[in-house]
Design a protein with these regions (language model features):
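Divalent-metal-activated hydrolytic enzyme cores
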Residues: 1-35, 67-91, 102-200
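N-terminal short beta-loop-beta anion/metal-coordinating cradle
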Residues: 18-59
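Short beta-strand segments
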Residues: 40-42, 64, 94-98, 177-182
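Active-site cofactor/substrate anionic-group-binding motifs, chiefly glycine-
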Residues: 46-80
Length: 200
């Protein structure tokens, strides 16, 4: 049986290194998490939230799914948003997509993928409502545009949740950001920001 010993060894080396540099790190971490940020991103293994924004464990609360989709029937995602806003009292929600996203590629294709097609329906709707913006573009430009448009659409969905609307009505300091990440160069790009003063 493969027990993934190499990963356990990696963990031990990592924990030892952290303690050598900061002996109280895990003691502090075990007290309570108090992140200022909620990151909602893609499940893609190349897009690791903490590393991309260079934050330590405990500094960012993370939720990931295929193609960073936020829909009002996904109680997993909604529960994460509610906990982050109401219990952790995060100040920022970051919706981060990325170029060359496999979920976005699949949504652009015209063949069946199985159960994931139900999830990709939300992205296909973005295409359907913006058909004219994709006319005349080659496949790569369509893909990049859809990756960006999907981020903006999901930011709108976050802003329209009852959780965020309630927070804004209560005067809570909460800003929702839409970013996109380039796997080719490791750089984030800002696309959109909304707060309680925005009209979404």
């Amino acid at each position: 049986m493969n027990t993934l010993k190499h990963l356990l060894d990696n963990n031990l080396a990592w924990a030892t290194s952290i303690k050598e540099n900061d002996p109280e790190f895990f003691t502090r971490l075990s007290q309570q998490q108090a992140p200022k940020y909620l990151w909602i991103g893609c499940s893609d293994s190349r897009v690791a939230a903490n590393q991309i924004i260079n934050l330590q464990p405990g500094e960012v609360f993370v939720h990931r799914n295929i193609a960073n989709v936020v829909v009002h029937t996904d109680f997993n995602c909604l529960s994460v948003i509610q906990f982050a806003v109401e219990e952790l009292k995060v100040k920022h929600i970051i919706l981060c997509g990325h170029y060359d996203c496999g979920g976005i590629k699949a949504a652009l294709e015209n063949h069946e993928h199985g159960i994931i097609d139900n999830w990709l329906r939300h992205i296909k709707d973005v295409i359907r409502f913006n058909t004219e913006k994709f006319e005349g573009l080659d496949h790569e430009k369509k893909l990049d545009l859809l990756c960006e448009m999907n981020v903006k659409e999901q930011v709108t969905n976050i802003c329209n949740t009852t959780i965020v609307q309630k927070a804004w009505k209560q005067g809570k300091e909460l800003t929702v950001h839409g970013w996109i990440y380039s796997i080719k160069n490791g750089v984030l790009k800002h696309l959109v920001t909304h707060d309680s003063a925005s009209k979404v």
